[in-house]
Amino acid sequence: MRILGLDVGTKTVGVAISDEMGWTAQGLETIKINEEREIFGFDRVSELVKQYNVDKIVVGLPKNMNGTIGPRGEACQRYAESLRELLQLEVILWDERLSTMAAERLLISADVSRKKRKQVVDKMAAVVILQGYLDSK
C-alpha cells in the first residue's frame, strides 16, 4: 500500500510517495500547473498513481494559524475533490500549516543553495505533509 502526498500551490504541485510499508515519505517530483488556465496536472498525478500502485492520496490543506480555511485552502479542497472523483481513490486533506517553512529549514540546514531550494521546496513540503500523516498512523 503506497500513499501519495501532494503540496498544491498556484503554479506547482509538490509530490511525495510513501514506501510500501507506509513508514517513510520521499520526494518524487514537482508538477507544473496553471490555475488561471485550468491546467491542474491531473494526468500526471494519475500516471503516478498507476506507476506506484497508490491507493490513497494525502493533500496538504493550508489553514490559517487560527484554524480557519482561507482562499488557498478552499482551492486545495476543490483540488482534492476533483482527484477523488477522477481517480476513485480515498483522498485525505491534511493540515499543512508551516510545512513549506519546515521544508525550507530542512534545506537550509542541509546547506542547499537558494537556487536549488527554490527548485525542490514544493517537493520537500509534500514530504513534510506526507510524513506528518504517516507518523500519525
UniProtKB/Swiss-Prot annotation:
Subcellular location per UniProt equals: Cytoplasm
Keyword S-adenosyl-L-methionine carried by entry: no
Looking up Pfam families in the UniProt record yields: RuvX
Q: Which UniProt keywords apply?
A: Cytoplasm, Hydrolase, Nuclease, Ribosome biogenesis
Q: Please name the InterPro entries in this protein's record.
A: RNaseH-like_sf, YqgF, YqgF/RNaseH-like_dom, YqgF/RNaseH-like_dom_sf
SUPFAM superfamilies xrefs: Ribonuclease H-like (SSF53098)
Q: Name one GO biological process term.
A: rRNA 5'-end processing
- GO MF term set: nuclease activity
Q: What is its EC number?
A: 3.1.-.-
What EC class does the entry list? hydrolase
Q: Gene Ontology terms, cellular component aspect?
A: cytosol
The main location is: cytoplasm
Instruction: Please give the family membership noted in the entry.
Output: Belongs to the YqgF nuclease family.
Described by its record, this protein's role is as follows: Could be a nuclease involved in processing of the 5'-end of pre-16S rRNA.
| NCBIfam families (alphabetical) | RNAse_H_YqgF
What is the designated name of this protein? Putative pre-16S rRNA nuclease
Species, as recorded: Bacillus cytotoxicus (strain DSM 22905 / CIP 110041 / 391-98 / NVH 391-98)
Q: What is the lineage of its organism?
A: Bacteria, Bacillati, Bacillota, Bacilli, Bacillales
